[in-house]
Every structure is written in C-alpha cells, then in structure tokens.
C-alpha cells in the first residue's frame, strides 16, 4: 500500500479533521514513537492513530503523526506529531488521562452502539496505564 494511514478501532474524528500523506518538500517521512525516530523510506505516509483516539473539530494531523491509544487532541494549530498513549493534548500542553475517566468514556461510547466494553479490554487498558505510569 503506497499512501496509507493506519487507524485503530473506536476512533472519533471531529468534523473537518484532516491528514496529510505527503510532505511539502516531497521528502521521506520520519515517524517518532516516544524518543525513537524511524526512517520510513516512504514519500507517501499518513498517520498512525491508536484505538479510542478522539480529535476535536478541525484537527490538522501532520504527515507521519503517531497518536497513542486513548489520546484526545484539542488544538487550533498542528498538534505534536507524537502523542503518547492515554494523553490529552491541548494548545497549552499535554497531560495524562485518568484511567477511570478513560474507562468510563469507553463504556459510554460502546453503550451508544449497543456493545459492551468488557472486563478483558478494561483490564488491558488498566494494565497499560500502570505500565506507562512507571
């Protein structure tokens, strides 16, 4: 697949959210995860969006951005290209999402669609939260 974005499950893109899959200089796209930068050797590459990510209206997602599961992005400008898991990103900075608030929102979201947020998935995210808090 030549020009791809990778989107997880239960993602909510606010109206007008956009993503670029080509740099203005036609250079190869680099992707950053945590403190590590990867050379993709690709000219066309969109973004990587984890499960349960939410963006606000009009979010502009840059080429090669990585948004971790459970993150929420609210920004009038281009957000960071690397937003860690379970993180709220606003124009004033980043903060960790409280796990109980995240779990409650997952239950609400899935209930709207007649689906359960089951104990296995809940425990997965609780364990993930503990891992990233260390």
Report each predicted region and the residues it spans.
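Glycine-rich hexapeptide-repeat left-handed beta-helix
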Residues: 1-133
């Amino acid at each position: 697949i030549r020009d791809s974005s990778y989107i997880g499950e239960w993602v909510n893109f606010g109206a007008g959210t956009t993503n670029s899959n080509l740099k203005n200089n036609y250079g190869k796209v680099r992707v950053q995860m945590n403190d590590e930068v990867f050379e993709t050797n690709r000219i066309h590459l969109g973004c990587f969006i984890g499960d349960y990510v939410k963006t606000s209206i009009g979010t502009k997602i840059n080429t090669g951005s990585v948004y971790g599961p459970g993150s929420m992005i609210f920004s009038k400008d281009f957000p960071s290209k690397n937003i860690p898991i379970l993180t709220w990103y606003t124009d004033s900075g980043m903060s960790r999402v409280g796990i109980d608030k995240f779990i409650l929102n997952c239950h609400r979201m899935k209930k709207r669609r007649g689906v359960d947020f089951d104990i296995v998935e809940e425990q997965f995210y609780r364990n993930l939260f503990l891992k990233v808090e260390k």
